[in-house]
């Protein structure tokens, strides 16, 4: 996707060569030979430990913290603060618990739309994605540990804020983590060999694209399997933590137990994310053909104009 620079200053380093996948004209008699869509740099070759570091981050970012236990803790505080009348004063008037939760979700998603419009394109373009993932992860860790101080009903408003920010942090970290796997797949030794075969005319472009797709699917599916197995062990430890805190003894113990579980799962996430932060190779992303921020809005506009052409 190429376009004239709209006049905004570039916000990322130079990305990949936009001529990839074309036809190179040879010096002798106009001879043509295919150019592999992925030009390899030995510095960016994907290693086994880097792939496992990628999987490890997903084990940590399993959703137990800000997507499962945090919503439960938040709604617990709402019900306890509301009492028998089941209403609380929020956003200018008394509202039911369901209304408050729905409004909180709406606020969270509205902010996510804005965030993804502004920085979403950095997941695919330029070289900023790893740094953005680190920053967003730190925000998520801070929210997770902050729940240790929010476990009584009078702090339900603080819980509301943590709930909203936590949802945003979880979704954005997951998005920027997911965006790394095409680069991992296309820099594996297997895909490098396929690119050489394609450049030599041994395989067709369709065969190369099929190998690329299969490698990406392999990394994505294995990541899900590894994450699921790892989550089982985390949940087993969590059961022990619940008994240790004696969550069934009282409402206060149950509230405290949820906060402890959120913090524990956050600690696991933090530890498992460090290898990925250290071992990820800063590969260049795609070339947006324009300022990276503008590229996000351009993609939205293009989707809105092209969606009507989809077959029903």
Protein language model regions, located:
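Intracellular loop-helix junctions on the cytosolic face of multi-pass helical membrane proteins
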Residues: 1-50, 148, 158, 172-312
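C-terminal ends and interior cores of transmembrane alpha-helices
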Residues: 104-109, 113, 133-156, 160
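Conserved glycine-rich helix-kink/hinge and helix-boundary motifs of the Major Facilitator Superfamily
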Residues: 55, 99-102, 134, 214-217, ...
């Amino acid at each position: 996707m190429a376009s004239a620079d709209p006049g905004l200053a570039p916000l990322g380093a130079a990305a990949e060569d936009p001529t990839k996948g074309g036809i190179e004209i040879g010096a002798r008699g106009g001879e043509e030979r295919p150019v592999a869509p992925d030009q390899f740099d030995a510095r960016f070759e994907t290693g086994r430990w880097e792939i496992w570091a990628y999987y490890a981050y997903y084990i940590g970012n399993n959703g137990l913290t800000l997507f499962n236990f945090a919503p439960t803790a938040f709604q617990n505080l709402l019900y306890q603060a509301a009492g028998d009348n089941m209403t609380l004063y929020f956003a200018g008037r008394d509202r039911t618990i369901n209304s408050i939760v729905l409004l909180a979700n709406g606020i969270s998603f509205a902010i996510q739309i804005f965030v993804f419009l502004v920085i979403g394109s950095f997941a695919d373009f330029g070289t900023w994605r790893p740094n953005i993932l680190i920053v967003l992860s730190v925000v998520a860790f801070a929210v997770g540990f902050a729940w240790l101080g929010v476990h009584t009903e009078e702090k339900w408003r603080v819980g509301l804020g943590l709930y909203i920010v936590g949802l945003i942090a979880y979704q954005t970290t997951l998005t920027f983590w997911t965006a790394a796997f095409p680069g991992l797949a296309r820099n594996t030794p297997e895909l490098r060999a396929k690119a050489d075969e394609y450049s030599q005319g041994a395989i067709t472009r369709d065969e190369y694209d099929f190998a690329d797709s299969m490698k990406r699917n392999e990394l994505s599916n294995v990541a899900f399997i590894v994450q699921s197995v790892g989550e089982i062990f985390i949940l087993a430890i969590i059961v022990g933590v619940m008994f240790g805190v004696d969550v069934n003894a009282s409402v206060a113990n149950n509230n405290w137990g949820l906060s402890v579980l959120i913090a524990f799962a956050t600690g696991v996430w933090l530890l498992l994310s460090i290898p990925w932060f250290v071992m990820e190779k800063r590969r260049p992303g795609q070339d947006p053909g324009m300022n990276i921020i503008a590229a996000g809005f351009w993609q939205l506009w293009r989707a809105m104009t092209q969606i009507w052409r989809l077959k029903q």
